[in-house]
Amino acid sequence: MKKIVIVGGGIAGMGIANTLADKLKGKAEITVINKEDFYFAGPSRXIL
């Protein structure tokens, strides 16, 4: 089994982790390394 390590658990890191998990369907172990032990998705602001 392949092992994938993603450094950074922000919106991009979590996004690619979810995308890879969907595409690889258990064929790889995905680890996300982040300085925090949680992920907070706050509301986005409108771009004016």
From Swiss-Prot:
SUPFAM superfamilies, alphabetized: FAD/NAD(P)-binding domain (SSF51905)
Coiled coil: none
Gene Ontology MF annotations: monooxygenase activity
Pfam families: Trp_halogenase
InterPro entries from the UniProt entry: FAD/NAD-bd_sf (IPR036188), Flavin_halogenase (IPR006905), SQRD (IPR052541)
Post-translational modification: The blue color is due to an unidentified non-fluorescent cofactor, covalently bound to it.
Primary role: Ambineela is a blue protein and has a pI of 8.7.
Quaternary structure and partners: Monomer.
Protein name: Ambineela
Organism: Acidianus ambivalens
